[in-house]
Regions:
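Non-catalytic, alpha-helical, charged scaffold/linker segments
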Residues: 1-32
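Functional-site microenvironments in short loops/helix caps that host divalent-cation chemistry
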Residues: 14, 33-221
Length: 221
């Protein structure tokens, strides 16, 4: 990470971002509930994760493209302030939710307000519900089955043709609000970048998961 002179620390302007770690702990609530004889320390999971995203993704994921400008500018230049974050692992997304909970509850405590329960990633079922925007049986968040509107413009940023990332006029990512939101006023529920959820996706999950607990990773299902 390279800092401008005005933000340097003791004259040092470069930092190895891999050394910035966030330490946090979570509780295995299911084990705690199932095995009541366990001690609190037995169900606490301590983890350490890198704070910053992988800033080399533009080079690694597109090895044969000229992506040096994206690599150099995407994570710090103000021109990309409204663009989605990339290069974040599932573990980092989990850690951010944990940090956000701590940060929010610190503020709540300073104002003598009630704590928030917990920030977390949505389950796959929750994400799908949000992505549908209230529509039933729709292929896309805007309904479908077409990917273009009546003016011939694509409704989301994705690769519409084989080997062609530019057909939708967006070679890379675009601003988060570049396309219309769905009926829940949520943006980018299709296209632009992939999004992490709490549980993995299984196309057969409707056949064996409980509607009360649609978590495909839960062994109780």
């Amino acid at each position: 990470m390279y800092l401008p002179m005005s933000e340097s620390y003791n004259g040092q302007r470069t930092w190895d971002v891999k050394k910035f770690k966030f330490q946090f702990q979570t509780m295995d609530i299911k084990s705690a509930a199932k095995y009541k004889e366990l001690k609190r320390s037995d169900v606490l999971i301590k983890e350490e994760i890198e704070v910053y995203p992988d800033t080399t993704v533009w080079i690694r994921d597109f090895a044969y493209s000229y992506n040096e400008p994206m690599h150099n500018d995407y994570f710090w230049h103000e021109a990309y302030s409204d663009y989605p974050v990339v290069g974040v692992s599932w573990e980092q997304a989990q850690a951010f939710a944990q940090w956000r909970t701590i940060y929010k509850n610190g503020y709540q405590k300073s104002k003598n307000k009630d704590f928030v329960n917990k920030y977390r990633l949505p389950s796959e079922a929750e994400w799908e519900y949000a992505a549908r925007g209230g529509l039933q049986g729709a292929t896309y968040p805007w309904g479908g089955p077409y990917t273009k509107n009546d003016r011939g413009c694509f409704m989301a940023n994705f690769k519409p043709l084989r080997g062609d990332y530019a057909a939708d006029q967006a070679l890379y990512t675009v601003e988060a609000d570049a396309y219309e939101p769905n009926d829940y006023n949520l943006y980018n529920m299709a296209g632009n970048v992939s999004e992490w959820v709490l549980a993995s996706y299984d196309p057969s999950s409707y056949e064996y998961t409980s509607t009360m607990n649609p978590d495909v990773n839960d062994v109780d299902n």
